[in-house]
Amino acid sequence: MIISVKEIKKFIICVLIPILIGYLSFLISTLISQTSFEIQYLQLIKPDFAPSSDVFQIVWPILYVLMGISYYIVIKSQKSTQKIKEASFFYYLQLALNFLWSVLFFGFNLRFVALVEIFILMLILMAMIYTFFNVNVKAALLNVPYLIWITYAMVLNYFIWILNK
């Protein structure tokens, strides 16, 4: 199977978009708060099950790559345009919410607002996985680790909010 340069570019763009959005969210959060993510995270009172800040720097890039690959699979599928549009809507909506969470939590220190927002993100992510499933099962399954991580992050967000009131 020969893959065109155009397809390789499309794949790379699909993978880079979530990575860049994630990077920008942490950059903007740092600019707003004038403190890096690592320093803020270290200063928080956290529950015993909270990971070290290094874990986030490993997990998020992996999740962003999986998101990008899954979206590429969706847009390359032979399913109806309507199904792809619906999946794309939820994909970009969850990316926007993903971006916003870091700004709320780290940029503005709005822990409770971030908690509400991550709950909405989790619901939108479930809708995205469902719409991806209707297009391509593998694309949907690639996002299950993301859903698990977001659920964990939501629980962590809750306890950090409670412990740091």
Specify the residue positions occupied by each region the protein language model found.
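Interfacial helix-start motif at the membrane-water boundary
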Residues: 47-65
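Perimembrane loop-to-helix junctions flanking transmembrane segments
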Residues: 37-50
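Core segments of transmembrane alpha-helices
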Residues: 60-72, 94-97, 121
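Membrane-interface helix-boundary motifs at transmembrane edges
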Residues: 2-6, 75-85, 133-141
